[in-house]
Amino acid sequence: MADTYVGAIDQGTTGTRFMVFDHSGQVVANAYEKHEQIYPEPGWVEHDPVEIWENTQEVVTKGLADAGVGAEQLEALGITNQRETTIVWDKETGKPVHNALVWQDRRTTDRVEEIQEEDKVEWIRGKTGLECDAYFSATKTEWILDNAEPLKMQSSRGADLRERAEDGELLMGTIDAWLIYKLTGNHITDVSNASRTMLYNIHDMEWDDELLEEFGVPESMVPEVRPSSDESLYGHTDADGFLKEEVPVAGALGDQQAALFGQTCFDKGDAKNTYGTGAFYLMNTGSEAVASDNGLLTTVGFQMSGEPVQYALEGSIFIAGAAIEWLEDVDLINNAAQTAELARSVESTDGVYMVPAFTGLGAPHWDGRARGTIVGMTRGTRKEHIVRATLESIAYQTRDLAEAMEEDSGVEMTTLRVDGGAVKNNFLCQLQSDIIQTDIARPQVDETTALGSAYAAGLAVGYWDTVDELRDNWQVDEEFSPEMDAGKADKMYARWDDAVDRSRDWAQEE
């Protein structure tokens, strides 16, 4: 009998990856395709959902072919995705009515400020655990319904999108729901993605009627919410579709929750930080939804079939790896691999601080009008100093979150598990350990996001029996311990606070 595997579709901000894992959690196949970033106006970011679906089919087909694995050898498919990014599509045709509004998109900042002025921020936080921000799906869905050009279709000539939504002709969802719909024909999301919409009550674990009304989203538009690892399955791929097989689709997690799962952070107090486009620090808080006094989000971590939901505290940094991309954009570096070498070539930043608030600041500051800032430059400043300051900014932002996390949870962290593209950079890992004065553990399989969704899907179909099997799979690649004096780290971090202050509240309304 041929070996069997679990597949994972990892639909990220910059591209789509398909990976296949074996029983020991090792990578068998890996294919990747970038998609276009669309910037119609400053602060606006869109993706084409059709391109994403086409790329998904392409990477799945290519990944299987390259590894010599047949679709019939897949016991299950899991999905993980960039969270909050929002799509509205036509129920009948399956066609999007507008490009996806990406999580980084700031076009609804004015609407968020309106909500703040109406004193509804605490009301929203109480229900959703979220800070009221343009980051989440609620204001994005509202914007699409109010502003997208209606599709000129026979059935809807003259009818605007709001009317069509009220008539039950439109569906909305985050990327996981879009992919599950395209793969299985079912309109389903998981608890972790639902918890990021700002429309879902994380205490009652259901769509919140008052929030749906506040943002003008009819209940007929929202997907059914299921566990992240679902024994009753989200559906099967179509035997007549691109895979030519009925593969169970059984697991879904927003990317950061998937990384928490993939890092086997199954117990209260376990924490991980993922360094991708942004950086996302999550701590499992068990069956208690811990409210934050420090600008962190209370969110759903994950849920397995028949088990209580596990909550998490989350700190979201909007720009981490994207700050390194910016160094490339402005020709300070040729590629990301150069950053460590350049940063090491100088002993310090020579007083330069870089605050990468290109799309505002996330936790714990939540300032949508903050903008990217470099301070402390002199005529002696060289590009090496700016590169080093950029890497340091990632470490400082993480310390912002680590301190908030310890204060809210009362749990002192001993080791932080890290993953994501940027952790291949040893210089950054060591710097991170120095700045937060904590041990850093990097696992052997660094694509933990895809691994987490594969684990969720595999558990649902019995490919793995228990989470203990998954814990045994987790292997450390390298550990980093603080080498910097704590006093020096504190001093450097205090100046970071000053630099952040200078970036705040910069963007003006036109």
Swiss-Prot record:
**Amino-acid positions noted as binding ATP in the UniProt annotation, renumbered to this chain:** 13-14, 277, 321, 421
What residues bind sn-glycerol 3-phosphate, as annotated?
Answer: 13, 83-84, 135, 255
The residues listed in the UniProt record as binding ADP, with positions renumbered to this chain, are 13, 17, 277, 321, 421, 425
GO CC term (a single one)? cytosol
Q: Which reaction does it catalyse?
A: glycerol + ATP = sn-glycerol 3-phosphate + ADP + H(+)
Keywords of the record, alphabetical order, are: ATP-binding, Glycerol metabolism, Kinase, Nucleotide-binding, Transferase
Write out the residues that bind glycerol. Answer: 83-84, 135, 255-256
Q: Offer an example of a GO molecular function term for this protein.
A: ATP binding
- Briefly state the protein's biological role: Key enzyme in the regulation of glycerol uptake and metabolism. Catalyzes the phosphorylation of glycerol to yield sn-glycerol 3-phosphate.
Q: What is this protein called?
A: Glycerol kinase
Q: Which organism is it from?
A: Haloarcula marismortui (strain ATCC 43049 / DSM 3752 / JCM 8966 / VKM B-1809) (Halobacterium marismortui)
Highest classification ranks of the organism: Archaea, Methanobacteriati, Methanobacteriota, Stenosarchaea group, Halobacteria
